Amino acid sequence: MILVTGTLPLQPSQKDAALDAVREVQRHTRSEPGNHAYEFALDIDDDHRLRIHEEWASDEALNEHMASAHFAAFLERIGDKLAGAPEVVRWDGATSRPLFE
């Protein structure tokens, strides 16, 4: 399992346009083979910061996503809407289980 987490700082004046770009990339990505989760959420303490959570079955699935036309289009659309550099981290993990059983 590959996890991707991070944040995207948004320019306040570009927040709505950024959210439109996110909705579009989510629509395509959630149906990709090997994608288990593709979520963005506004930070509870800063509503101009998006939190990223992705889950992928394999390196291959993540690499195919990153090479896709819709992800390239997202990068193009989101770039000028950011207030700073994105902070995105990839995590490699083998197992998961419910925290509260």
Regions found by a protein language model. Name each.
Residues 1-37, 44-50, 57-67, 83-101:
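Short S/T/G/P-rich N-terminal loop/turn motif that feeds into the first structured element of a domain
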Residues 42, 79-80:
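Short secondary-structure boundary/capping segments
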Residues 71-77:
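Outer-membrane beta-barrel domain signature
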